[in-house]
Swiss-Prot record:
It comes from Bacillus cereus (strain ATCC 10987 / NRS 248). The gene is dltA. This is D-alanine--D-alanyl carrier protein ligase. GO terms for cellular component: cytoplasm. GO terms for molecular function: ATP binding; D-alanine [D-alanyl carrier protein] ligase activity. HAMAP family: DltA. The keyword ATP-binding applies.
Amino acid sequence: MKLLEQIEKWAIETPDQTAFVWRDAKITYKQLKEDSDALAHWISSEYPDDRSPIMVYGHMQPEMIINFLGCVKAGHAYIPVDLSIPADRVQRIAENSGAKLLLSGTEVTVTDLPVRIVSEDNLKDIFFTHKGNTPNPEHAVKGDENFYIIYTSGSTGNPKGVQITYNCLVSFTKWAVEDFNLQTGQVFLNQAPFSFDLSVMDIYPSLVTGGTLWAIDKDMIARPKDLFASLEQSDIQVWTSTPSFAEMCLMEASFSESMLPNMKTFLFCGEVLPNEVARKLIERFPKATIMNTYGPTEATVAVTGIHVTEEVLDQYKSLPVGYCKSDCRLLIMKEDGTIAPDGEKGEIVIVGPSVSVGYLGSPELTEKAFTMIDGERAYKTGDAGYVENGLLFYNGRLDFQIKLHGYRMELEEIEHHLRACSYVEGAVIVPIKKGEKYDYLLAVVVPGEHSFEKEFKLTSAIKKELNERLPNYMIPRKFMYQSSIPMTPNGKVDRKKLLSEVTA
């Protein structure tokens, strides 16, 4: 697959087809090509001998997609930076990346950045004055050159720049289009901010198939009335999000086939897909295919996938995350560095062309997480799991296991069983510390329909069900009830916010 050529062919075949929609703003494939060509021509003329990455700042504006393509056509990787990212972090990204230029279709509120800023009217002037100019195709990003760099949280407190090459992205996009049976001209949900690599799962599969990206922003998500009004107008056919976001939508009774009659495919990544969430989706959208996928940012979005059917739901209480894409392989490594046999838990290691070339400007971190196995790049995920007959089962983060009163446990396992209880719509487990040790577990619960007059009676009923599924030491000591679970801008459960709320 020639990625950029595949996107550009739609400017010729379907020039007036909408490529991207955000609120009242939209761009066609013709405009996407013309403006990204103009921008690439300007970048090449301004920085003829430079290939440093370029920061692209904003939140869901159509100009961001134009800027992404303009950067790579000129031979520069882009760094997506969402408006929600704190100024201090933006500053550290600018310093770590060595970027010299920041592009934005909106006002840049961060000050004192060590980069040249081109935003709003200046960007539009470039589109206008360089219109009709085409960049030299030899300058475009290719092969093992970086296509984009996404910054993720680092254990040291400093963000890590994950370098994803052109070849990495091509491998992912080709697999996604083929394995998920994506069709020409479909409408894709774009829920994840561009600084979160889940967005790559909708951006490039949509653009290479001549589809339309329908973006919903964080303000819509915070106002359910606006969110569902937008969804009703969208005619979305391919849904890409975290499971938490879909679970939130399922709390609205009208979120069903009647709202989105042409829904064909649900693609989930970024979190564990609870069995009960998948089951509700099958009930609400009986004609749609549900795909559960797995992969870290360091392995280009996702490397495994499985079609979740009723048979799969009945067979597995904790859903598998799928079979590995054909050009990669999975190894389960034991603590002693040997490969675990089928069915035995260990650390998930991903090998193959989806694996990043490492962290930008951080050789020590790269050496710690990445290695070479049989001549191929490999990434040690820090995730626990096992493989049975080629099917991967994810068992949470190795560092998401806690020791409570001498017992080692996985919080996600408790959450899984809690969500399966009657009267529970959503739930998160928060471990509470006393000094340096964990003291007890708190369950934050979004209750479902029930007839209990007092909260303690509801808690007793839930605990009774949990006692049938979990040992006593894994039963939460305290329960707190909320109308919703807070989420990060990326659509994941905001565990830090929850912890600050319950310990305040």
